[in-house]
């Protein structure tokens, strides 16, 4: 399987290195890191979707609070759809989307791929639909995903894998792609593991924000 690393959105909040760990100026620079996986028989698989075309054209889909706080850079050229098409593929080639979680900067592109099956933890679906707290109402934006279909929710169950519990394969996808529950950043947050010839790649979503968080003697993850 070939994996493309895509930046599908940009946010530049005030705070510099205090926010992202490395920026030199007043503003931090955060990317929406997505993966595009080319499979042999199951088409393209997109891991997270960043911001979508709807977010660029209709800013009201996003929380006004987070638009200001995160200084979201709305650029159509950075959407997952634009990135996929720039690689020579079509929207229809994306047959599966796997979400680490449903935050606005990860789920915004769902409506740009209307025929894709959507895989994520069932707990995340339930939490996003209920939106009990103010923060949940700001971070989970139904306008980004309420019109989509083909959702597949997964329970916390499965096999032990490299010290992680309840890791599971995904329906309709090769066994080299696994869903890894990583609750914390959100109740139904998950990582996506992809087996490659040289080893495993784990997309951790927002379980950590900066690579040095995983290099310190005492690791700090969200």
Set out the residue ranges of the language-model regions.
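Short hydrophobic/aromatic-enriched beta-strand-loop microsegments
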Residues: 117-122, 203-205
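Active-site metal-binding loops of divalent metal-dependent hydrolases
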Residues: 9, 49-52, 102, 124, ...
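Metallo-beta-lactamase
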Residues: 72-89, 93, 122-181
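A hydrophobic, small-residue-rich beta->alpha segment in the mid-to-C-terminal subdomain
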Residues: 204-222
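Active-site environment of divalent metal-dependent phosphoester hydrolases
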Residues: 14, 102-107, 186-189, 209-212
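Active-site metal-binding motif and surrounding structural segment of the metallo-beta-lactamase
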Residues: 60-120
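Core dinuclear metal-dependent hydrolase active-site scaffold
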Residues: 5, 22, 34-39, 156-196
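Conserved beta-strand hairpin/beta-sheet module of binuclear metal-dependent hydrolase folds
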Residues: 2, 10-82, 192-205
